[in-house]
Amino acid sequence: MKRAFASLFVILILLASCKSKSEKITVKSEDGSKATIDVSSLADNAEKMKNRNEELQKLTPLTLDELKALLPEEIMGAKRDNMEATKMAGLANFSKADYKIDDSTDVSLSVFDCAGTAGAGYYNMAFLGMMSFEKDNEEEYTKTIDFKGDRAIESCRKKQNRCEFTFFGKDRYMVQLKGDNVGIDKLKQIGSDLPLK
């Protein structure tokens, strides 16, 4: 795990130090999708990731009951349903619940505890997705944003009203909100209201 993290850190530093005069790189695929990466912040983000990883490894992972307690009773007036909490060897422990607002509208909340060695490893994988980038095509868009002083990812399918919002909270939780017929602004508001930020 540490060897993989060290390799990743070196690659990120090399990318940042070898950047061209342009601080953003845009790649376009054959299907018209575009992805833009802001290389100016790679070195800073890699250092932040390394420091946070070291702190996460020192923390003790939560129990199943503590994980379940992270899930609110209600979101948007909908009661918590299909709740589960899972401890998996080698992966981050997580809790998850669904909140059905009506027949076509629902929110799913997942909270990953990034504490301990396994959780810190999950954080490293998830954090790579939080480097500064933007992807856009006819079907969907995904981009990193600033959310209360930290990186977050927002993603929406354009033809359906289906969005996802992922952020890091309380210096240990990777929080993911998914909404069917719930827009990205509403998911951000829900994320702001959770006691996890």
Tell what function each PLM region has.
Residues 1, 23-25:
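N-terminal export/targeting signals for secretion/compartment entry
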Residues 1-16:
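Sec-dependent bacterial lipoprotein signal peptides
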Residues 4, 30, 42, 102-104, ...:
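Generic structural motif
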Residues 9, 93, 105, 171-173:
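Residues at beta-strand starts and edge strands
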Residues 18-21:
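Bacterial signal peptide processing site
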Residues 26-52:
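Post-signal peptide N-terminal segment of mature Sec-exported envelope proteins
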Residues 41-45, 49-50, 135-197:
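A short, solvent-exposed beta-edge/loop patch
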Residues 54-154:
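Short, solvent-exposed recognition patches
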